Amino acid sequence: MQNTTHDNVILELTVRNHPGVMTHVCGLFARRAFNVEGILCLPIQDSDKSHIWLLVNDDQRLEQMISQIDKLEDVVKVQRNQSDPTMFNKIAVFFQ
């Protein structure tokens, strides 16, 4: 994973948890040539949903990407997460 900068932001998605959802989300980014720097996905306890956190570049296309993500059938909610984007570096250290 690359070093994060102030130009990165975390998007938090709540999605329906079933096979293929991650493919739809990542496919949207791929089709728009919008790089995802980091991904974390965890199921929501006692639910059929999951949270996906995406570390992405905060550029002029981001608002349009958020709008497109929100239109995906299995996305229940998408928002900017106010956490420090460097949390992805801390997670990476854990797995090294």
UniProtKB/Swiss-Prot annotation:
> Which BP terms in the Gene Ontology apply to this protein?
branched-chain amino acid biosynthetic process; isoleucine biosynthetic process; L-valine biosynthetic process
Q: Where is the ACT domain?
A: 10-83
| InterPro entries, alphabetized | Acetalactate_synth_ssu (IPR004789), ACT-like_dom_sf (IPR045865), ACT_dom (IPR002912), AHAS_ACT (IPR039557), AHAS_small-like_ACT (IPR054480)
Q: One of this protein's Pfam families, by short name?
A: ACT_AHAS_ss
One MF annotation (Gene Ontology) recorded for this entry: acetolactate synthase activity
Q: Please state the Enzyme Commission number of this protein.
A: 2.2.1.6
Q: Show the SUPFAM superfamilies listed in the entry.
A: ACT-like
Q: In which pathway does it act?
A: Amino-acid biosynthesis; L-isoleucine biosynthesis; L-isoleucine from 2-oxobutanoate: step 1/4; Amino-acid biosynthesis; L-valine biosynthesis; L-valine from pyruvate: step 1/4
Can you tell me which family this protein belongs to? Belongs to the acetolactate synthase small subunit family.
> Extra info from the record?
E.coli contains genes for 3 AHAS isozymes: ilvBN, ilvGM and ilvIH.
Q: What is this protein called?
A: Acetolactate synthase isozyme 1 small subunit
